[in-house]
Amino acid sequence: ISLAGTEASGTGNMKLMINGAITLGTLDGANVEIHEQVGDDNIIIFGMNVDEVNACKSGYKPMDIYNSNAVVKQAIDTLQYGINGQQFNEIADSLKNSDPYMALKDFDSYQKAQAYASECYKDQTKWQKMSLANIAGAGIFSADRSVEDYARDIWGCLLYTSPSPRD
């Protein structure tokens, strides 16, 4: 899951969308475009937006979050001290000391979004409506539309329409 402002765009979530998946993600990359198509009610966004990320970068101290958030501390300590005999010190140290993707900063928002996703899933009518809204909104990502846009906007080509068989 990318930090807002760090992902150019990806197609994986578009493939999921066209099959009815509901996106749970940051407002970054293709998620911005998906959000524009399906609206606030049919995508689950968490975390900071680009402006908030930029404002936070200069004074961000992930260790402050580690020290003040018991859930974050427990998760990182589990990485540090091991899971089933495996230690993940490099990941734990990166999160505590630099956290370049500001995962700790977005953590509380992610937890709330995950809880909301679970609530939505329990209401099957709501979940199905969200799913159908994603399928219906996915047409903008079709290859036909993309090729037509490239042909017109980049290559300056006119759209070819074949004559009717009756002509």
Regions found by a protein language model. Name each.
Residues 160-167:
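Conserved small/polar residues in nucleotide/adenosyl-binding loops
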